[in-house]
Amino acid sequence: LLCISCCVSITECCQLMSGCAVEIKS
């Protein structure tokens, strides 16, 4: 799965602000 984030850091967004991130199938 790839993570598309509306935050600056994709990793931080996925871990800390999941509500700001969207997981999609690759």
Curated annotation (Swiss-Prot):
Post-translational modification: Contains 3 disulfide bonds.
GO cellular component terms attached to this protein's record: extracellular region
Keyword Repeat: no
Keywords: Disulfide bond, Ion channel impairing toxin, Neurotoxin, Secreted, Toxin
Tissue: Expressed by the venom duct.
GO MF, one example: ion channel regulator activity
Protein's cellular compartments: Secreted
Role played: Acts as a neurotoxin by inhibiting an ion channel.
Record text about domains: The cysteine framework is C-CC-CC-C.
Protein name (database record): Turripeptide OL49
